[in-house]
Amino acid sequence: ELARQIGLSAPATADRVRRLEAQGVIAAFTVELDPRALGYTLQAIVRVKPLPGQLHLVEELLRRIPEFVECDKVTGDDCFICRLYLRTIEHLDDILSKVTERAETSTAIVKSTPVPRRLPPLVEDEHAHR
């Protein structure tokens, strides 16, 4: 399928993929699951600001809670911006209760995702438009 999409033969495509893997450009092949199909009908973005002296403990806590599917350490007033997949608002409350003992949180419920996670522009494409 990939070969057809990029207009190369299957062997040429396989060779290119192997080279990109060897160069570290392709880091992994993944499967994308639909969280809704697994019962996770709610998404939340949670900003987390650890209480004084709690930074490392909060970071470890966020790693251990599987509903935190991604979390970035950021600059600014908060230390972390995290995405959670949840089943209900009560589920959100249960998860946040584990965090609020050691951090302040600010939560936003995701209504929609107009720009889903995507790759940055490829270098070759960027030069082609100049």
Where are these regions (language model features)?
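A compositional/biophysical signature of low hydrophobicity enriched in polar/charged and small residues
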Residues: E1-R130
